[in-house]
Amino acid sequence: MQVFGSSGTRGRVTEELTPDFVLRVAAAAGTVWGADRVALGRDTRLTGPMLANAAASGLASVGADVDRLGIVPTPALQAYADREGVPGVMVTASHNPPAYNGIKLVGADGVELSVERLEAVESALLDDDPAHAAWDRTGTDRTVESARRTYREELLEAVDREAIAAADLTVAIDPGHGAGALTSPEFFRELGCDVRTVNAHPDGHFPGRDPEPVAANLQDLGTLVRATDADVGIAHDGDADRAIFFDEAGSYIEGDATLAALADAVLEAGDTTVSAVNVSQRLVDVADANDAALELTPIGSTRIMTRIRELERAGKRVPVAGEGNGGVIFPDYRINRDGAYTAARFLELIVDRPASEVLEPYDGYANVRRNVEYADEAERATLVETAGEWAHSADGEVTTIDGYRVDFGDAWVLARPSGTEPVVRVYAEAHERDRATDLADRLVETLERAAAGE
């Protein structure tokens, strides 16, 4: 049984993710940590209070006092964990639909647990023998009101506040009713920006849009950018560890292009950057142009962060890393994804020229993403096997770090099972959208026929 996927553990609440399960995961984590205190945060989902209570109970049962941060972005919990030297539990399902929730586990250094540490927690969970404290040694709760404010203050100290303020930028923000609604608008006002918002009230129903910040869900933000003559649009996912952008014309910017621009601004010869197996050719080209190395990992922030730490221990400089979904990591700041920090770093790029001009060198790439759903583990296995057969029969170079990626020279396609949802994700990229669409559609059609038993 694998409990933790590419970004923690998630599921539909009361079906796959129950309060009892959350309690047991928290107790297992507390047993492995052996910590006197643990930080606990959540996003805006309706089931957040229920599951946070379950997590607090599990932690208290093994003797840990619980610092309840309330609704905070995941990077705010990570900053608190790092500052206080305590591990943390974040109740969030990030970009998943409202019926989902989940858990991310954070170490006392503020970094998501490594694969090795997650496996230790998973073993403790499956052993079902938590280190329960005596009745008079169980943990207590305390409410921490200052976590969001302190997080914003630390952000302000970490970016070029003067340059951003001097640029007199108008910023349109769509926090998507998530945790970022309570931090990002105020942060960018404190940076001296004229802030306009949409979907900026916390609401676990996510009435304005789904939490995932993809183009299909962000039409309101594009409209707001155009209506307010904003310099840039910024969108977050449910826990605000990602940032996706619109340019000054209200046009959606691919996350891969943003990652390439941010990397191009900081990479130097001899540096290393890290991304996942679905990396865009944009980042490959940027790394080559800067004489920097690019290392690939299986998909998921945990895998990328683990590799960053390994590289840094080996003496390598990793100034930037991340994925094309808006999850960018600047290890010199923190080894975590932070949507607000990423957005501020992007603002630094547009203080003297428009966003469209900044992104122009990274045009000419088309990305397509599809999902193929499966009903059970048997169907999942069929889809994965079929993807492998398709990949090895194609006229291209096959990579099997995570799923099956086929590089054709002018394009690539990847199929891999999601670590958080019952779907096989299909990614494709080419210089022409028709080529990328054709590759994705051909593979999806093959998978769907296999799932139907054809």
Predicted regions and their residues:
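Phosphate-binding and adjacent anionic-ligand microenvironments
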Residues: 271-427, 434, 438-454
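N-terminal small/polar loop signature for handling phosphorylated ligands or for N-terminal nucleophile
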Residues: 39-101, 186-246
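Gly/Ser/Thr-enriched, mixed-charge loops and adjacent short helices
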Residues: 99-224
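Short glycine-rich phosphate-binding loop at a beta-alpha junction
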Residues: 36-43, 67, 170-172, 271-277, ...
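Acidic, glycine-rich loop-and-beta core segments that form the ion-binding/anion-interacting portion
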Residues: 211-296
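Glycine-rich phosphate-binding loop of actin/hexokinase-like ATP-binding domains
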Residues: 89, 102-118, 240-269, 276, ...
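An N-terminal, well-structured beta->alpha segment
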Residues: 1-55, 59-62, 68, 86-87, ...
